């Protein structure tokens, strides 16, 4: 069993499964997309030399029968699948709960069949499926201070304490390498905040000073790369503050060890990593 939902650019959703108005006949394009392999052929030698490879765009084709009243249900489809406009497709089965963004390429209707059939083609420039529920991982941890037996003094006692870790394993539960969203909130003065991937040696260093309350937001995902500073309610781009040679982090599937530091004030850095797992197919 599976669930298929379409969301249009206005945030309106239409479930195509478990819906008496439509009967899905087939969905093509849910498997891993075709790879394009670039090679060079050398004169006089058999075979070729591998140069590079990339995944093709994804095309999803949904074929469904339109149940009665056909006119009403067909026109309702047009609200969610508008040619050239964006649409988000949600797909859930027993092991995946994912979405993918695309654009409606064509909605073809067999108007004069006894039962009308719609074939909807969606073009997805980014071919990977994304987890619906992003995994938010805090560099800080909570140390439990509540033990039995106990007595509470007049001044009170703490039940737990937040420990600001400077190194932590950040997990990517997807099948593919993916970018990451990182937020760093300063609780005091931080000079030149730094983030390191311990295993790969990649680093990202910002040549700037943060004041208490400042928030740095980093996004290393394909198509969304950005570094911004939110200070006193105003958000500005600070990509220009990246030190030369800084890397845009990419997380391998599984555990990725990260550490945070600064020239001074590292203890005032509260870092949170948000990972959206990606998959080739469902």
Describe every region a protein language model picked out.
Residues 1-57, 97-108:
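Solvent-exposed edge beta-strands and adjacent loop segments
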Residues 65-107, 257-259:
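Short, acidic/charged, Gly/Pro-enriched secondary-structure junctions
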Residues 42, 55-59, 84, 115-117, ...:
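A general secondary-structure signal for short beta-strands and their flanking turns/coil
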Residues 30-33, 114-125, 214-231:
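Short, surface-exposed secondary-structure junctions/capping segments
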């Amino acid at each position: 069993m599976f669930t298929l939902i379409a969301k249009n650019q206005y945030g309106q959703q239409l479930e195509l499964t478990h819906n008496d108005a439509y009967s899905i006949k087939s969905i093509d394009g849910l498997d891993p997309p075709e790879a394009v392999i670039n090679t060079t052929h050398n004169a006089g030698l058999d075979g070729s030399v591998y140069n590079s490879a990339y995944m093709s765009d994804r095309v999803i084709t949904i074929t469904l029968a339109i149940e009665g009243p056909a006119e009403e249900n067909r026109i309702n489809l047009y609200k969610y699948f508008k040619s050239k406009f964006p649409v988000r497709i949600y797909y859930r089965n027993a092991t995946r709960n994912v979405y993918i963004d695309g654009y409606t390429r064509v909605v073809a209707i067999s108007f004069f069949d006894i039962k009308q059939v719609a074939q909807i083609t969606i073009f997805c420039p980014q071919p990977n499926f994304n987890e619906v529920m992003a995994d938010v991982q805090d560099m800080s941890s909570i140390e439990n201070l509540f033990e039995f037996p106990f007595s509470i003094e007049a001044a009170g006692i703490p039940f737990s304490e937040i420990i600001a870790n400077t190194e932590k394993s950040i997990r990517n539960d997807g099948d593919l390498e993916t970018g990451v969203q990182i937020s760093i909130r300063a609780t005091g003065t931080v000079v030149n905040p730094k983030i390191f991937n311990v295993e790969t040696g990649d680093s990202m260093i910002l040549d700037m000073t943060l004041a208490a309350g400042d928030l740095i937001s980093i996004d290393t995902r394909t198509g969304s790369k950005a570094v911004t500073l939110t200070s006193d309610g105003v958000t500005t781009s600070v990509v220009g503050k990246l030190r030369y040679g800084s890397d845009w982090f990419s997380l391998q599937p599984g555990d990725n060890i990260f550490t945070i530091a600064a020239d001074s004030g590292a203890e005032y850095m509260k870092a949170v990593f948000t990972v959206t797992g990606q998959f080739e197919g469902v």
